[in-house]
């Protein structure tokens, strides 16, 4: 997978939490992106699945239930917390173009 800048996020992009020696990795896929036409602020809707990876669900925004299932992107942040995982902004990946 290729790296993607947070400012260029698109549906189908994936936040990849790398596995280490004592923990499984995790992935969260971007299902949709919305942008406020006045401010340019972006919000993303995410989906994830757990083990076994055979069903996925839209993630709930526990930190801001008023806008759930959307997550507001802070493009100046170094990391983002979704669900149980904290992702670095460099963890955003995309599939290479065909």
Which residue ranges define each predicted feature?
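Residues that flank catalytic or metal-binding motifs in active/ligand-binding sites
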Residues: 11, 24-26, 42
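Short beta-strand-centered aromatic/proline hotspots
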Residues: 25-35
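Extracytoplasmic/periplasmic, Sec-exported soluble proteins
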Residues: 4-7, 22-25, 38
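Structural motif
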Residues: 7-19
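Short, solvent-exposed loop/turn segments that connect beta-strands within catalytic domains
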Residues: 36-42
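Conserved active-site-adjacent core of cysteine acyl-enzyme catalytic domains
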Residues: 1-10, 58
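Low-complexity, Gly/Ser/Thr/Pro-rich intrinsically disordered linker/tail segments
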Residues: 43-45, 49-98
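Active-site-proximal beta-strand/loop segments in catalytic clefts of secreted hydrolases
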Residues: 18, 33, 47-50
């Amino acid at each position: 997978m290729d790296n993607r800048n947070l400012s260029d996020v698109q549906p189908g992009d994936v936040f990849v939490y790398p596995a280490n020696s004592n923990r499984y990795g995790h992935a969260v896929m971007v299902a949709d992106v919305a942008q406020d036409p006045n401010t340019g602020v972006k919000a993303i809707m995410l989906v994830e699945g757990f083990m076994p990876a055979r069903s996925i669900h839209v993630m709930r925004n526990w930190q801001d239930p008023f806008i759930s299932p959307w997550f507001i992107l802070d493009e100046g942040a170094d990391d983002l917390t979704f669900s149980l995982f904290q992702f670095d902004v460099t963890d955003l990946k995309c599939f290479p173009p065909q």
